[in-house]
Structures are given as structure tokens and as C-alpha cells.
Amino acid sequence: EGTDDPTGGYDMTGFARGADVSWLTEMEASGRKFYDSKGKERECMELLRELGMNAIRLRVWVDPENGWCSKEDVIAKAWRAHNLGYRLMIDFHYSDEWADPLDQFKPVAWEDHSVEQLLEDISSHTKDVLSALKNLGINVEWVQVGNETHSGMLFPDGKTDTQTGSENFAKMITAGYDAVKEIYPEAQVIVHLDQGNVASLYSRIFEGLKTNGGKWDIIGMSLY
């Protein structure tokens, strides 16, 4: 305490123990509060750090209807995490709303774009958000390019149920990868799927990416 160390003396290194707190600002705005085991009201991220968390994940939506998880909202949460010494993962959904295995809706502003335009959209959106974070001195350790992409992304163009779709998906992942490395060369890029217990799914997606020139550093796996 009383130093410039944002970690508050907590060890934020080693194995990443993280929480996705993307709903936090919306929850706070609706009046929700957080309490420790003694019933004392606490700031959520401070309490999580005290309980052993050392990393925060934040999702990004392109133009969400109510503003939550927008670029500006993400910056506000990332700044709070940064000032507590957290390591940070940014999760790009490339959608105006939640992207999951069945729903990979294009942002409204991208709906009529060609595949080549979509690749530019991915690149510019990724660089725009990450540049804003970097300009504030915030380090980003991991970047997730797409969310639960077990059937691809930006449907129908990047849906992996056809050869062309699989090729497009690899191009989209690579567009995101290259954009990340341009802003944060040391950041680790994650391709994220759900159903971590289904080996055939991972073989299909990652063999397809490999065959079609897709680039990634880490396989992200969710198990529910």
C-alpha cells in the first residue's frame, strides 16, 4: 500500500485464474452490489483479486443496442482491471450481440459486405479496440478471435459446413490474428470452441484451419 504497484501486493503471476466480468458495468448500473463473506459491500474486481483471481476476460461487441460490451464499455472495465494489476484477455465476438455455436450473426453494419470486406472489417475493428487500450498503457496478454466458433463465424460466409465456408473461416481467423499482432506483438491469440469433451470437433476445426492457412497461438476450450 502507498506505492505505485497496482497489484496491491497480490501475486498476479503464474497460472492464470480468471473471471469473465463483462456484465459488471451493466449489473452495477442496475443497482446490483457485491459483498464479501463478512457481509461488507465490496468492489467486485477488488474482491475477486482478494479471493485469488489474477486475470480478467472482457468480451467486445461491435455495436450493441444498449451499449454494454461496446468498445467504450470495454475500455472502462479494462482500465479498472489494469489499475488493480490484473492480466487481461479480450474476447472479440465480431457481432452486435452474443456469438455462440448456433448464432454467429454479422454486425448490422457488416451485413451486406463481401468476404473481402468482412476481412477488412475484422481487421479494422480489432485494431481499433486494441489500439485504444494500448494508448492507455493497458497490456493485453491474450486475445480471443471469435467466440465459440465450433461452426465458424460471421454466418453464412464463415460457416464451416462447406469447403468455401471453411476457407473463409480460416481467412477470418487470420485477419484477426494479424490485426492483434500488429498492435500487441506479444499477445497470445486464441481460437475458442465449446464442447471441450468432443475430440472430433476440435480435430475438424483445427485441421480445417491448418489446411487453409489459419493462424493461432492457443486453443481455447470451454467445458460446461
Protein language model features and the residues they cover:
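Active-site cleft segment of glycoside hydrolase catalytic domains centered on the general acid/base Glu
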Residues: 70-75, 79, 100-214
